[in-house]
């Protein structure tokens, strides 16, 4: 068998023509130092700020410090298996999370991965977690109410859709309870709720999820959790992941409520990262950009203009104070960013006033324009009445000889405080709130014993439901106040049937 040189050269030429190069150019760096969730990497000269990188063991990281000779990378996962000398690959992607309807009812971590054991989340849509807030011309002023179902808030510190309302108070003053009740009250309100738990105990998050499930609220809620046992970068990223999931709905014309529980822990996680990255510390050892950390997050809550679809994100950030000190660094920062604050006081909480809202220090800067007409009418003087009662109460402790007007004010104040108390996980529809506040402000409760106020309220609602349902329907459908005569007839009719306890 003879081998022909022409055939061989033809074969070689054919092979050369069919050859496809599979050379892939990758930007690879080398770990020069690792520890405490931070890796220093040499060789990634073209990396972008905030870009995702992949370590040789599959763990992801995020580029934070771009220095002359190395890159400071925060590791988004376990870092114990990463060694000096390991390769680090660029991905060319900025941090993204999955978004869309498929997330509703699920519990995810800040990377958008499910942690509820219910299988993968079947969505291919993602959004970058850092995005620009809507501009001035893309916004509209807040004008629709967001009913929390809590009398003290809806009457005194009303919240509108698209507002940022800070909830501030010491630990164990019922901050989370206020948020949970607000989420429960959004049932049938066409709202999507996102609860972001930052640095909470896993048992606490489990309790919140069970409460939401029991009341059917998981049908419209996404839970994003970065528990206390997780690395600091995940605690820092959690709020951004939550608001990004909300933005997908907002830009599609829907209304979203995002609860950040709580931003003090996010600030502490960011401080930890910044100090490990050797950034210069400032006041209370926080880095210089801790204000920007929160402002760029909360500015993404907005009420969009009609041209942009009219969707909204309402933000309820929490900040924990130490011994009621609202003049500390993080509290003052977040107060200045938000459109008002609800201050929960431990003294009130322990004296049995729950929710423990301090009406004097709490304020809503834009919510008043979103309040429905009926509520505006009955709650107009409530804040002043409550403030003057608190003042008189302190004064009345010293003397027993009080004139009739002062005594009447004290009596009315005691009943006001009693009416504004509310049980846990029992949000109240706005029409019922208006009914009891009308009875209070028009003096119908003045001759009812303080101990009977709770029962009076419950029985009044039942009586109106059965005999004067039109009153409730008018408020729920139009937001307007029915005529005073109708109210007076209903409440006087009820009072004739109400039996005071002995």
Swiss-Prot record:
UniProt-recorded Gene Ontology molecular function terms: ADP binding; ATP binding; proton-transporting ATP synthase activity, rotational mechanism
Cross-referenced PROSITE patterns: ATPASE_ALPHA_BETA (PS00152)
Keywords of this entry: ATP synthesis, ATP-binding, Cell membrane, CF(1), Hydrogen ion transport, Ion transport, Membrane, Nucleotide-binding, Translocase, Transport
Highest rank taxon of the organism: Bacteria
Leading EC class: translocase
Record note on quaternary structure: F-type ATPases have 2 components, CF(1) - the catalytic core - and CF(0) - the membrane proton channel. CF(1) has five subunits: alpha(3), beta(3), gamma(1), delta(1), epsilon(1). CF(0) has three main subunits: a(1), b(2) and c(9-12). The alpha and beta chains form an alternating ring which encloses part of the gamma chain. CF(1) is attached to CF(0) by a central stalk formed by the gamma and epsilon chains, while a peripheral stalk is formed by the delta and b chains.
Family, per entry: Belongs to the ATPase alpha/beta chains family.
Listed name of the protein: ATP synthase subunit alpha
Annotated source species: Bacillus pumilus (strain SAFR-032)
